[in-house]
Amino acid sequence: MGRMHTHRHGKSHSIRPATLRAPSWITQSPAEIEELVIKYSKDGLTPSQIGIKLRDQHSIPLIKPITKKTIGEILEENDLKAEMPEDLENIVKKAVGLQRHLKENKGDRRNVRSLELIEAKVHRLSVYYKKIGRIPATWKYKSVVAQLE
């Protein structure tokens, strides 16, 4: 995904496998992989962290070709899906951390703009997730940029 508020492209990502077939070197069955996903989720890992752990420690590049389900679908079947989508939660955490920084460092005007951009992204994502029904329609993020100025 490209960066939202700049003219540069987002280049930081791992290269996905060229084919979407299940690799021949995987010895685990789909049921065993689903159990690993459930176990890691109960340990408190997010879906992206689960995917990274499976890739790095178990040599499983993609879950979907093997299990015919995504990590999110596996978690949803087992009632382990988070209430708030992972990307929205991460951006809200980032905004809260930046708010804390700006309260301690009043002269940091540059990061006021960064907070504005982060909050704009929160609002855009929240509109999308409300529209598809992933978060409640009453969910609201309170902006603090207006209070800082």
From Swiss-Prot:
Highest rank taxon of the organism: Archaea
A Pfam short name: Ribosomal_S13_N
An MF annotation (GO) of this entry: structural constituent of ribosome
Disordered, as annotated region: 1-20
Assigned GO CC terms: cytosolic small ribosomal subunit
Biased composition (Basic residues): 1-14
Entry-linked CDD domains: Ribosomal_S15p_S13e
GO biological process: translation
Key words, A-Z: Ribonucleoprotein, Ribosomal protein
Subunit structure: Part of the 30S ribosomal subunit.
HAMAP family on file: Ribosomal_uS15_A
Family, as annotated: Belongs to the universal ribosomal protein uS15 family.
Stated name of the protein: Small ribosomal subunit protein uS15
Record organism: Nitrosopumilus maritimus (strain SCM1)
